[in-house]
Amino acid sequence: MPQKLILRNHQSPGDLVMMLYALTSLHETYPGEYVTDVNVTVRDLFVENPLITQLSEKDPDVRVIKMEYPQINESNSRPYRFSTAFTAYLADQIGRPIKPANFAGVIPLGAHEKGWYSAMHEVLQRDVPYWVLNAGHKSDFTAKTWSFARYQELVDALPDVQFVQVGAKEHIHPELHGPNLTRMVGKTDTRQLIRLVYNSFGVISGVSFPMHLAYAVPAHPRFRRESRANITIAGGREPSHWEQGPDHHYLHTSGMLTCCAKGGCWKSRVVAMDDNDEKNNSLCEAPMMMEDGQWVPKCMVMIEVDDVVKLVRRYMDNLDYSPKS
């Protein structure tokens, strides 16, 4: 009889994408030997996934595993990766080795989801290559942010490139604008965001949920390529080997400053906020105030607009696009 497992994790959506790799790896390594369900904060990530079977934690035959990734605690000094950290933990929990799954495309879409027009098609009445742009950050967690003004400069520098700005309404996002930008902040639920990424040519963001979706969601056939363009403005908060995904342009400054000379600093905020939160005890060692008054970590300021523009241009110059696919 297959063993019944419920994987429990109540962290952020990006963490759940990494947990999904562990779930996929388990089934690929031991096909037919496990029946699995999840207890998570964002259940919609697992919709359309054939590996999910509804189970009850009250069933005595069900084992509930609280999913963690303790390898993060040694990620500055060991060659651990976020994508396989949950897998290593799950292997320890079941007492069996698990071979990591294919690195990309583990979030399936239903046939009906693939068949719908993209959100950009609804706006422009045609399909175009576009980039999903996440320029925001969590309201209480600011250390991952790039300059909001530079995001606007990026949009302005690429007038022939279409962008769709996304993000959760409860987070902090700049009000970007331009004839080449469609603003959809607060207008997508999880499945809508997945479909938006599915139909996109690329994703530009900080270290975030959309960054993980860029390679976890399959590439659309119209782009005639097996991976999605993925540019992340990362700085030096995390060790680059920990976060970087497949075919991923991960713009980091690890090793360039004393505060991230060996791995990431893992700080929470750029400067203290007036909320008495414990995150005020984890502050950037090199905060810089931009001309508009925004505080940004120096490791992020070191990444110029032109660094991102050149990568976007390189991708677009090699675009092989078939809108009818």
PLM region descriptions:
Residues 6-7, 38, 133, 165, ...:
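Structural beta-sheet core signal
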Residues 17-20, 143-242:
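Donor-binding and catalytic core of enzymes assembling or modifying cell-surface/extracellular glycoconjugates
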